[in-house]
């Protein structure tokens, strides 16, 4: 089930009041239009008739029933509370949710990326490993650039990685490379399990035994 609410905002440019929709819970199957807005980022954007645009920051629980996955975008201050909530669901939840994956993210970019990974039926653990290998390669090729974040997204059916930092760069991600990493680490990933709540760059660094510094 999806849950949304209306809020009224005032445009700081023209002063006009507008109603916006805040999605507290978004079900991918029940709301395909809003799912696409999440994928392209517009669901977190306010656009006034005068042309003014601004970001909207609000937490969201994203539910993809097809992939048996819930992703919760929360503030850093709410992480522990969300961890406890997911622990309770695992302990007392309905039987059909026993094989669900639960993830916690603390940025809109990370939520959009998780949604894109689910949309393409990929494993976010494998994707984090792929991104880490690309990060190391790009850092070696461009040591002068600071890379703050690497994000997976798709465009026109093409898999891409975006490098955000002192300079924005984009690289194509061949399907074959993803499959190579998936197969190479399949046994270790199976052994590690898929119950982690925080599957991100730090997880990938720890999984590969790299120095987090």
Language-model regions, residue ranges each:
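General N-terminal targeting signals
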Residues: 35-39, 63, 71-73, 78-79, ...
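A broadly tuned preference for mixed-charge, low-complexity surface segments
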Residues: 26-29, 60-71, 110, 159-162, ...
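Domain-exit/linker segments immediately C-terminal to small folded modules
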Residues: 47-127
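C-terminal, charged low-complexity interaction regions
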Residues: 129-213
